[in-house]
Design a protein with these regions (language model features):
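Conserved catalytic-core helix/loop/strand module for nucleotide-ribose chemistry
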Residues: 1-132, 136-166
Length: 166
């Protein structure tokens, strides 16, 4: 079925809507534990509302959910002990998508957001240089995020990952 841009984003909104999240199923997933394990700054490529919903189910609040274009809030949070910030660097489905959406989904959007000296690259590099990062659920395969991490890592910086056993 062919969709125009507006209809395409309407379908994406519907599919990834927070109302589609099954609370009982979410409580069985590892993501449900994130609010119990981390009470600080969270970075994600996910544009859905699962992390926010997990915080709600755990009766915890995030101070701010940011996405590209919120650099000032991101940089302010980096310097605080308990920012309770979720930064969704591929955008946020909850912001109401349209054909000029800020989520990163298409090849064209990836090229635009990840181009040299883009605000997104600047934001991620600052995060990687300012904080130790724990990667959860990331494959850590060679991709744009790993390329940024490699270019941003300074001698002596420490980052962590929890990976699936194969």
């Amino acid at each position: 079925r062919m969709l125009g841009k507006a209809n395409f984003y309407a379908v994406i909104n519907e599919i990834f809507s927070e109302s589609k999240i099954d609370d009982i199923e979410l409580q069985k997933q590892a993501i449900f534990l994130v609010p119990q394990l981390f009470n600080s700054f969270i970075l994600t490529t996910n544009f859905d509302r699962v992390i926010e919903h997990a915080f709600k189910l755990n009766n915890q609040e995030l101070n701010f959910v940011g996405h590209p274009g919120h650099s000032d809030i991101l940089f302010g949070a980096i310097g605080t002990e308990d920012p309770r910030l979720l930064y969704k660097f591929h955008g946020d489905i909850g912001q109401g998508l349209d054909s000029s959406s800020n989520i990163i989904l298409t090849a064209e959007q990836y090229r635009a957001f990840y181009k040299k000296n883009s605000p997104l690259l600047r934001d991620l590099k600052k995060c990687f240089r300012s904080r130790s990062i724990l990667f959860l659920g990331a494959s850590l395969e060679k991709d744009r995020t790993m390329d940024i991490l490699e270019s941003a890592v300074e001698r002596g910086s420490i980052h962590y990952a929890i990976l699936d056993c194969k």
